[in-house]
Amino acid sequence: MAIMRMDNVLIVVDDLDAVISFFVELGMELEGKGPIEGRWVERVIGIDDVRQDVAMLRTPDGHGRLELFEYLHPDAIETEPTRPNDIGMHRVAFSVDDIDDALEIAARHGCRPLRGVATYEDIYKLTYVRGPSGILVMLAEELKTT
């Protein structure tokens, strides 16, 4: 037995449509959206009487996928958004072709860089933004060398 590939990353959100809009405008593609409930999902996630709306998004190259859950029952447990130095998984990163354009899109959704854009060794321009539902998103533009 061996892992073949990473299939997706799940993010629980408080406003599914707002999060879909944010990521689709940044360039992800919506694969599907719909309700999920029943014994099979209760068995998988270990929560009884669960009902949720789910969406699956993919990157344009088809190699990365985000699964988004908005819990209808039971209510999602709201926590403080993670900070970059919190232990555990807390951000999703995307390569973008133009970080300034990506930041304009993020701004239309009320999202701003945590501290600004930095250049790493003339290789990348990088920033973290706090997206909808408190999702920490890293945007990275690879700098072209000529």
Task: Label the predicted regions.
Residues 79-86:
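Non-DNA-binding regulatory cores of transcription-related proteins
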Residues 38-42, 75-79, 120:
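A cross-kingdom feature marking solvent-exposed beta-strand/loop segments within repeated
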Residues 72:
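Residues forming the ATP-binding cleft of Hanks-type serine/threonine protein kinase domains
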Residues 12-63, 108, 127-128:
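Core segments of cupin and vicinal oxygen chelate
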Residues 6-8, 87-91:
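Eukaryotic phosphotyrosine signaling hubs
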Residues 2, 11, 33-35, 56, ...:
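Vicinal oxygen chelate
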